């Protein structure tokens, strides 16, 4: 499959993949976990996009179900949870059902309860929460805040508890989001209408312009 993909023969690769996925789906958890852990740790490594290497049906029939099963089978091992949240986020939301509040965060909090001192889990949850803060703030340069201020204040507190080291880069980035969050609250209580101008008047570093991807 990988060789055919590399040669650009996607259709032929998919023909090879289906029987492999079908046979692997029938294997015991131990065999499937050996394959999935190798796939996530070695093949995907630092890749951001997983779809080309983990397409359907391998994704839905083998990889994601195995990660959920392994998570239940060995609650003390955080790898399955971290890979689910980091690599298969859409499937985490789908499994939780429509309207479920923050399924990735809840999975990580459950994992943290089983392994409270695991640095990787703490950082993964902090990174997830930071992503929410950043996403909710990415239109501040247009004087718009997309998130729930009170909820994001609680998320900021949670990040601080997860990362007590104030020099941690994730903590530093979170404190910057916190500064913007508090500035936004003060701005909303003022009579001004332009957040960037308000920041300039109050010696607050203004938010970066984040709407560039809407251009063109």
PLM feature spans:
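Short secondary-structure subsegments characteristic of cysteine-rich extracellular domains
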Residues: 105-118
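Helix-turn-helix repeat elements of alpha-solenoid scaffolds
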Residues: 5-19, 51-65, 97-105, 148-154
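Amphipathic alpha-helical repeat scaffolds of TPR domains
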Residues: 2, 25-51, 73-93, 118-140, ...
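Hydrophobic/aromatic side-chain positions at a characteristic register within alpha-helices
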Residues: 5-6, 89, 96, 113
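Extended HEAT/HEAT-like alpha-solenoid repeat tracts in very large eukaryotic scaffold/adaptor proteins
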Residues: 36-44, 59, 151-155
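Canonical positions in the second alpha-helix
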Residues: 20, 68-71, 110-111, 159-162
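Long, ordered, amphipathic alpha-helical scaffolds
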Residues: 128-131, 135-216
């Amino acid at each position: 499959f990988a060789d055919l993909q590399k040669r650009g023969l996607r259709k032929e690769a998919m023909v090879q993949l289906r029987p492999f996925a079908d046979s692997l789906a029938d294997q015991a958890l131990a065999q499937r976990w050996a394959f999935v852990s190798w796939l996530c740790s070695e093949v995907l490594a630092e890749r951001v996009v997983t779809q080309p290497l983990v397409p359907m049906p391998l994704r839905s029939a083998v990889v994601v179900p195995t990660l959920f099963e392994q998570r239940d089978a060995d609650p003390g091992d955080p790898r399955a949870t971290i890979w689910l949240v980091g690599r298969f986020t859409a499937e985490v939301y789908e499994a939780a059902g429509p309207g479920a509040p923050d399924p990735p965060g809840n999975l990580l909090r459950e994992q943290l309860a089983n392994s409270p001192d695991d640095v990787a889990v703490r950082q993964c949850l902090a990174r997830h929460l930071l992503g929410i803060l950043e996403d909710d703030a990415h239109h501040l340069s247009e004087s718009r805040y997309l998130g729930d201020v009170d909820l994001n204040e609680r998320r900021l507190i949670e990040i601080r508890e997860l990362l007590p080291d104030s020099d941690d880069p994730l903590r530093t980035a979170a404190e910057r989001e916190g500064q913007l969050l508090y500035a936004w609250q003060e701005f909303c209580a003022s009579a001004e209408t332009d957040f960037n101008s308000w920041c300039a008047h109050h010696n607050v570093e203004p938010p970066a312009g984040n709407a560039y991807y809407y251009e063109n």
